[in-house]
């Protein structure tokens, strides 16, 4: 699965792990995360993330 990085703070969203502390279950693809989700470190929305190449 593809990882995504926050362009501002460097947080990496790993779909294998998810973000269970913020309601995103392990195995959730980035595109399937609700638009209301924000980066757990800097609190910016999904538009500030880029795919890790």
Swiss-Prot record:
- Determine the domain of life of the protein's source: Bacteria
Q: Which residues form the Rubredoxin-like domain?
A: 1-53
What are the protein's UniProt keywords? Electron transport, Iron, Metal-binding, Transport
Q: Which cysteines are joined by disulfide bonds?
A: none
The leader peptide range reads none
MF terms from GO for this chain are: electron transfer activity; iron ion binding
Q: Which Gene3D superfamilies match?
A: 2.20.28.10
| Cofactor(s) required for function per UniProt | Fe(3+)
Specify whether Iron is a keyword of the entry.
Answer: yes
GO biological processes: alkane catabolic process
Q: Which residues cross the membrane?
A: none
| Listed SUPFAM superfamilies | Rubredoxin-like
Which residues are recorded as binding Fe cation? 6, 9, 39, 42
Q: Which PROSITE patterns match?
A: RUBREDOXIN_LIKE (PS50903)
Enumerate the PANTHER family for this protein.
Answer: RUBREDOXIN (PTHR47627), RUBREDOXIN-1-RELATED (PTHR47627:SF1)
Family statement: Belongs to the rubredoxin family.
- What this protein is called in its record is Rubredoxin-1
Instruction: Identify the species of origin.
Output: Clostridium perfringens (strain 13 / Type A)
Read off the lineage from the record: Bacteria, Bacillati, Bacillota, Clostridia, Eubacteriales
Q: Which gene encodes it?
A: rubR1
């Amino acid at each position: 699965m593809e990882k995504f990085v926050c362009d501002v703070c460097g947080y990496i969203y790993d779909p294998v792990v998810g973000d269970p502390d913020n309601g995103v279950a392990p195995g959730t693809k980035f595109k399937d995360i609700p638009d209301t989700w924000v980066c757990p470190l800097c609190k910016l929305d999904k538009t500030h993330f880029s795919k890790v190449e």
